[in-house]
UniProtKB/Swiss-Prot annotation:
Plays an important role in the elongation step of protein synthesis. It comes from Arabidopsis thaliana (Mouse-ear cress). Transmembrane segments: none annotated. Pfam families: Ribosomal_60s (PF00428). P1 and P2 exist as dimers at the large ribosomal subunit. Residues 92-102 have a biased composition (Basic and acidic residues). One of its GO terms (molecular function) is mRNA binding. The gene is RPP2B. The lineage of its organism: Eukaryota, Viridiplantae, Streptophyta, Embryophyta, Tracheophyta. Belongs to the eukaryotic ribosomal protein P1/P2 family. This is Large ribosomal subunit protein P2y.
Amino acid sequence: MKVVAAYLLAVLSGKASPTSADIKTILGSVGAETEDSQIELLLKEVKGKDLAELIAAGREKLASVPSGGGGGVAVASATSGGGGGGGASAAESKKEEKKEEKEESDDDMGFSLFE
């Protein structure tokens, strides 16, 4: 994400087609490190594309991704357990929460940003 942010800053500063050096300069100014391969991949993917169109396409893709609502059910079932069995259900819900956290990662959610 920091490479994308640096690219956007370069475009907003007036560079119509930022180079790898431009992005490295921006990232270096804040002490951020990145791999050259990430920068080159981004530049290859956005080459010849309009920034406004890329942002609009990204918004459309994000709008199709379902969000929220899943965690509330587990919390409600854990808190609704009565009396003596409450301890066991609380332990089960903690295990479920840990599993869910591992599943959530910085993957591409099934789509590419630049398609």
